[in-house]
């Protein structure tokens, strides 16, 4: 900006703003500080792989990844952890699947239901990997886990 009476704006990326707020909160809470010193910062999200995952779910993953990266850029030990809630039970057969085949799995955890496509360990594994296999294309760095393990 010119010096003709205009103020120079100091604008931070939203992920950096959130990272700064998290760091400040941790620094001001002795219990949190002690925990984070042992474990690092965890940015956590969870998805139930109940069928085709809506693209809107990706918004959360992009946000969480950006916050974890902002924390790391500030020298913090941080990681984004995405958990598949595959221990959750099937409560509705998706309309695009054969009801006769999958209705018998009502109430069964997604990790224990056969995949609709060969090559996957379970229903939950198939639908979770439909998205997470694309993370590299979007630059998302996540540690993947399963609630069923």
Residue ranges with predicted function:
Residues 2-149:
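N-terminal Rossmann-like or analogous alpha/beta NTP/dinucleotide-binding catalytic cores
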């Amino acid at each position: 900006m010119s010096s003709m009476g205009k103020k120079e704006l100091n604008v931070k990326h939203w992920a950096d703003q959130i990272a700064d707020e998290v760091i400040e909160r941790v620094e001001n809470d002795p219990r949190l500080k002690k925990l984070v010193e042992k474990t690092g910062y965890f940015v956590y999200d969870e998805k139930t792989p109940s069928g085709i995952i809506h693209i809107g779910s990706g918004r959360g993953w992009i946000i969480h990844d950006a916050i974890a990266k902002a924390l790391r850029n500030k020298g913090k030990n941080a990681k984004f952890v995405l958990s598949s809630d595959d221990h959750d039970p099937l409560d509705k057969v998706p309309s695009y699947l054969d009801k006769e085949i999958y209705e018998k799995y009502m109430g069964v955890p997604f990790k224990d239901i056969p995949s609709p496509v060969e090559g996957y360990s379970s229903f939950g594994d198939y639908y979770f990997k439909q998205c997470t296999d694309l993370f590299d294309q979007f630059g998302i760095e996540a540690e993947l886990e399963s609630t069923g393990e």
